[in-house]
């Protein structure tokens, strides 16, 4: 990964958490007990059902423990994925395991969005707002229409753009003609993560806007299904059996490229190697990587620690 933000350097965990919130809150959290029995990493998709045969640009799940890796699992749509994730959480709770679940989409929008949309800086208020309005099924969803609805609540044009559907959506431009909407283009973490996409782009290769809009409602429902059992990093202290974390598999692009040279599907390699890297790290190193304060915008787990993660992924 090229480029780091000035607040993203490695620190001694004993000295307190890195404040990466853009100065919006002074309090800092020190993560303790950051040791997980099992790590599941999810490559999400906002598209329609991708069929029975494993393929790229679909939902994939990687699973690892300190002892070894499971074969990556192909999930053909979000309904299947949500059901499986619920089963895995139930299984971990029944077994008394600590489970880390990572998702490759942002858990929040740039500072100020939540307040403008919901009247609150609490990221979970946005999760609930989206979940109450998104219609989602294996072969269709209303993400583009919902983005247009959000845009109508803001001045000017935007902040969302790139209607990738066949039907024109009022207030969601197909091209970037945005102006006067008042939102920052990127989160602090995205200004540090060179090559990352913004949350506002709803369509196009590599765009994550649709993933956020279809993914956060699923996370909201899982939190509601398992009350008091799931902590969401970095918004909450990791003192519950299950942790949700935001990932960006491109942090491991080097080791993924090495694996892809031998064949296979890139998405499958990404979740397998990301899960392996986080499962193989020593507890104190994982605690250091989790030692972040970004209470409104969230953060990408492992940004600034790319070399360490790639070394762990190569352990096999």
What residues fall within each predicted segment?
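RNase H-like (RuvC/DEDD) metal-dependent nuclease/polynucleotide-processing core
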Residues: 32-38, 44-316
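Short, Lys/Arg-enriched N-terminal segments with co-localized hydrophobic residues
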Residues: 26-31
């Amino acid at each position: 990964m090229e480029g780091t933000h000035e607040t993203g350097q490695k620190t001694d965990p004993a000295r307190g958490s890195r404040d990466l919130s853009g100065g919006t809150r002074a309090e800092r959290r020190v993560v303790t007990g950051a040791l997980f029995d099992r790590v599941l990493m999810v490559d999400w998709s906002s598209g329609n059902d991708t069929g029975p045969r494993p393929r790229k640009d679909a939902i994939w799940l990687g699973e690892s423990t300190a002892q070894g890796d499971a074969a990556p699992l192909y999930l053909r749509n979000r309904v299947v994925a949500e059901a499986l994730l619920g089963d895995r959480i139930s299984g971990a709770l029944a077994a008394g395991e600590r489970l880390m679940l990572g998702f490759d989409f942002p858990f929040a929008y740039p500072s100020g969005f939540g307040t403008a949309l919901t009247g609150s800086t609490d990221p979970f208020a946005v999760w609930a707002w989206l979940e109450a309005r998104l219609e989602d099924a294996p072969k269709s969803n209303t993400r583009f229409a919902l983005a247009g609805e959000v845009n109508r609540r803001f001045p000017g044009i935007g902040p969302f753009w790139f209607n990738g559907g066949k039907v024109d959506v009022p207030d969601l431009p197909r091209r970037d003609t945005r102006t006067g909407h008042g939102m920052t283009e990127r989160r602090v973490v995205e200004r540090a993560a060179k090559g990352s996409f913004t949350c506002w782009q709803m369509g196009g290769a590599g765009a994550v806007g649709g993933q956020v809009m279809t993914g956060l409602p699923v996370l909201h429902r899982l939190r509601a299904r398992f009350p008091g059992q799931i902590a969401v990093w970095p918004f909450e202290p990791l003192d519950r059996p299950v942790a949700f974390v935001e990932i960006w598999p491109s942090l491991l692009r080097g080791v993924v490229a090495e694996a892809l040279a031998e064949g296979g599907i890139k998405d499958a390699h990404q979740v397998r190697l990301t899960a392996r890297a986080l499962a193989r790290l020593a507890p104190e190193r994982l605690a250091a990587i989790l030692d972040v304060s970004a209470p409104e915008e969230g953060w990408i787990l492992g940004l600034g620690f790319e070399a360490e993660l790639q070394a762990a992924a190569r352990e096999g």
